[in-house]
Amino acid sequence: GLGDVYKRQVVDWAACDDFGNLVNPMIVEGQVHGGIAQGIGQALLEDAHYDENGQLLTASYMDYCMPRADDLPSFKVGYTNTPCTHNDLGVKGCGEAGAIASPPALINAVIDALSPLGVTDMSMPATPQKVWKAIQESQSVAAE
């Protein structure tokens, strides 16, 4: 099927964030990992579909694809430390920060990978079907 031929695979991931002083580094790292996983899901997998009456068609885990552990690479996470001056602990928020840059980074990587085929745009999520369609459309434009 298309999923095998047009498989997208994230093979490496590095992130660096500034959360000020880290009160509990293990919890912060978990938040970053969760955010990255969420961003990968948004960019490559998670796709809601509705029927003509507005009924959600992807309402179960059988129909709505989310990342599993085997969809994700190991994450390399680093931190800079610029303490916040607005609170006594010098901390900043870290909840799901990894989800901010993940989708555009992945979509740009997909477009870069497909650029030799003439693909210049890709909407999220970059499912195998959307990758196939983008390739077909770029090839039909090139043939004109």
Residue spans of the language-model regions?
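Glycine-rich phosphate-binding loop
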Residues: 1
